[in-house]
Amino acid sequence: MALIMTQQNNPLHGITLQKLLTELVEHYGWEELSYMVNINCFKKDPSIKSSLKFLRKTDWARERVENIYLKLQRHKERNQ
């Protein structure tokens, strides 16, 4: 029961890392993302595939990207 309640309050529940990253790239672009999160997979020959591979292995980087996504979603909600 606690897990269900936790997931209901999780704004990222049901959103894949690929969807999240794709939306960020469409909104900010790779160059801007590389300034926001200083990782090579955003700087040198960036691709969704290589970035997903890195983010799935690297918790701190994934958390930063998820936080950027959440801020973007809050900004979109305020402007509607």
UniProtKB/Swiss-Prot annotation:
Listed Gene3D superfamilies: SAP domain
Organism domain of life: Bacteria
Xref: Pfam families: VF530 (PF09905)
GO MF annotation list: double-stranded DNA binding
Keyword annotations of the record: DNA-binding
Protein biosynthesis as UniProt keyword: no
Function, in words: Binds double-stranded DNA (dsDNA).
Subunit relationships: Monomer.
Protein name (record): DNA-binding protein VF_0530
